[in-house]
Amino acid sequence: EFFEENIKQLNLFVMGVGNVGSKFLAQVRQQRSYLKKNLKLNIRVIGISNSRTMVFDDGGIALDDWKSLLADGQKADKPKFFETVQKLNYRNSIFVDNTASEEVATTYGSYIGNSISVVTCNKIACASEFENYQKLKNLAREYNAPFLFETNVGAGLPIIDTLKHLIASGDKVLKIQAVLSGSLNFVFNNF
């Protein structure tokens, strides 16, 4: 235990466990020991919600049994989910949105404003009015709670992070050319 003092605890609250969300939880489960040993990150999933039910466990949800625990959980309630995350008040809390819900996307400001980081594959918040995106990024800076959305762009390729690193190293982006539709990109590359 003494040697684990440098391990950083991340507390995840996951909304949306369909195809993407369930794969995400499987990946967390599979990589948990690697992350702890090599990156000094201990990841605990504290809350999980789908559109019907939600479940919380202060000690961390057993990821080998999350589906049955969720099935036996309480009725899903987005405001109550947020209130529970807020009430638990864990350091290094991260809200993970694996939905395509506009209603969920509108809650990001509340999470970030309570110093809860947001990681999302939901495109809605970043594809709405630019002012909304700016507000979320400003809140993230003000409350030191990252707002991360890398999977929104380029079919999950690390485009945004790559651009940030290029700019940080002094490069100037003069022009970006892209096919912004995954479907059209497929057609152009195959026909």
Language model features with spans:
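A short helix-to-beta-strand connector/capping loop
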Residues: 41, 91, 143-147, 171
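Short acidic, glycine/serine/threonine-rich loops at helix termini
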Residues: 23-27, 56-63, 130-133, 158-164, ...
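Rossmann-fold NAD(P)-binding glycine/threonine-rich loop
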Residues: 101-113, 123-166
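N-terminal glycine-/serine-/threonine-rich beta1-alpha1-beta2 phosphate-ribose binding loop
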Residues: 4-113
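Glycine-rich beta-alpha junction loops
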Residues: 49-54, 153-155, 179-185
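Conserved anion/nucleotide-ligand pocket segment
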Residues: 162-191
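General beta-strand structural signal in soluble alpha/beta enzymes
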Residues: 94-97, 118-121, 147-151, 175-178
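Glycine-enriched alpha-helix->loop->beta-strand junction motifs that scaffold or abut catalytic
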Residues: 114-118, 182
